[in-house]
Amino acid sequence: MTRHDRLQSEPTIWLATTRPEGRPHLVPIWFVWVDESFYICTERRSVKVRNLLANPLASVALESGTQPVVAECRSRLVEAPYPVEVVQAFQAKYEWDIRSDQQYNVVVALQPQRWLMG
């Protein structure tokens, strides 16, 4: 399976951000791949969002240990209204309308700056 195929089909990525004191924060999270960027939808008050607001650099990895896909990314918050393509991608992949979710209320775009594997 190609990297592009996996970016479209795999259910989760591992997202690594850095806490202000320098410790890593690593979490699995649903994502979509749209226009050469990862998009996640999460809670505005989450640790990952606080970390990314302080330091917009992050790494992401697909789960497979035998065919690793790892990217270093620069993040940015995407305010509502969310891009139609992103909304449609979450709906198609997870049957989830991110526009109507009150808990998961922020979208983060992660633009790969460098692919380390994959």
Put a short name on every predicted segment.
Residues M1-I13:
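Extreme N-terminal tail/first-helix region
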Residues M1-T2, L26-V27, R45-V47, Y94-E95:
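A generic local structural motif
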Residues L7-Q8, L53-A54, Q91:
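Alpha-helix boundary recognition
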Residues R3, R45-N51, Y82-V86:
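Amphipathic alpha-helical interface surfaces
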Residues P11-T12, L57, E95, W115:
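Generic structural signal for secondary-structure transition and capping sites
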Residues E10-E43, R50, A58-A61, V70-A71:
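Short beta-strand segments
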Residues Q67-G118:
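Charged, gly/pro-rich active-site loop segments
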